[in-house]
Amino acid sequence: MKIGVIGSGSFGTALGSLLADKGYEVTLWCRNDSQVESINRNHINNKHLPNFTLPEKLTASKDLRNVVQGKDMIVSSPPSHALSEVLREIKEYLPEKVPIVSASKGIENGTLRLVSEIFESELPEKYHSYLSYLSGPSFAKEIIQKVPTIVSIASKNETTARKVQEIFSFLYFRTYWTPDVIGVEVGGSLKNVIALAAGVSDGLGFGQNTRAALITRGLNEITKIGLKLGADPMTFLGPSGMGDLILTCCGEQSRNRTVGFRLGKGETLEQILSSMNEVAEGVKTTQSAYELSQKLGIEMAITNEVYKMLYEGKNPREVVKDLMKRDLKREGVSV
């Protein structure tokens, strides 16, 4: 089996490494020559994962046509804000009747489209039943280190979901399939917003009680907006919901938690983002999530406060204080 991976960031590279480790021939699309040369000559992604050796069956190319055309499966892993442009570039080369797996997470700024909505609007209908979405608690470095990991595979088409599940599942990588595309996407996107808040709490020196409170109430917000969009509430108790939320809020490898932590320590957002080599999806997703909650008429207190901190300059300590001063409520999810 020949597989093309679009996106040479840490997660796209990790998925490519997993698939190559299973024995598949994997070609990774990179935008710069030094990265291509480093992967092909030294089996190292010098830009994103310089300390890890990649399998020999993973090669790289700058030629998008070469990466996509004639492949038996396509894995798409660009940042969500770049997804529309990438899909427009690849669709003339995209093979028909092969699985297309998205690992992008986020909600598009301006349009407020989920990743699945971007795929379905940018690609012709003949591709739609072959689309699937991968999400779950999975740091890239730990996948490459072969640490046992579980994720969700969501597709509206059961045949596609089961095929992708079989292709990805391996000794250290277990997948669970679900038809709930919306639930998997909402969980994978909004957990990054909550992780920003958890990072701020840690940066300010608050304890684990506070982090647990943010995770708990964050799951409430994720579930509320998911239900409004038609998701199955049980999805949010699975790998792409609670699993990913816990990892992203607690793990030191989490880029979004790191951004929040540094904000809590007093750095500006501009300083933080300019120093990062990878995209922290939560920053852009916060804006979209805030606008979506306003559009749907859903109260999302944590999301609103993170938005004010990122885009209106609100002091991080005031964010936590105002969350604690909110009107008292009954426990539960109400939409």
From Swiss-Prot:
Enzyme nomenclature, EC number: 1.1.1.94
Recorded GO MF terms: glycerol-3-phosphate dehydrogenase [NAD(P)+] activity; NAD binding
GO CC, any one term: cytosol
Gene (name only): gpsA
Residues the record marks as active site: 191 (proton acceptor)
Matching PANTHER family: GLYCEROL-3-PHOSPHATE DEHYDROGENASE (PTHR11728), GLYCEROL-3-PHOSPHATE DEHYDROGENASE [NAD(+)] 2, CHLOROPLASTIC (PTHR11728:SF1)
Keyword presence, Membrane: no
Protein name (record): Glycerol-3-phosphate dehydrogenase [NAD(P)+]
Binding positions for NADPH per the UniProt entry: 10-11, 31, 105, 140, 255, 279, 281
Catalytic activity: sn-glycerol 3-phosphate + NAD(+) = dihydroxyacetone phosphate + NADH + H(+); sn-glycerol 3-phosphate + NADP(+) = dihydroxyacetone phosphate + NADPH + H(+)
Annotated localization: Cytoplasm
Keywords annotated in UniProt: Cytoplasm, Lipid biosynthesis, Lipid metabolism, NAD, NADP, Nucleotide-binding, Oxidoreductase, Phospholipid biosynthesis, Phospholipid metabolism
Family: Belongs to the NAD-dependent glycerol-3-phosphate dehydrogenase family.
PROSITE patterns: NAD_G3PDH
Main function: Catalyzes the reduction of the glycolytic intermediate dihydroxyacetone phosphate (DHAP) to sn-glycerol 3-phosphate (G3P), the key precursor for phospholipid synthesis.
GO biological process: carbohydrate metabolic process; glycerol-3-phosphate biosynthetic process; glycerol-3-phosphate catabolic process; glycerophospholipid metabolic process; phospholipid biosynthetic process
Pathway where it operates: Membrane lipid metabolism; glycerophospholipid metabolism
A Pfam family the protein falls into: NAD_Gly3P_dh_N
Organism annotation: Leptospira interrogans serogroup Icterohaemorrhagiae serovar copenhageni (strain Fiocruz L1-130)
Chief location category: cytoplasm
Superkingdom to which the source organism belongs: Bacteria
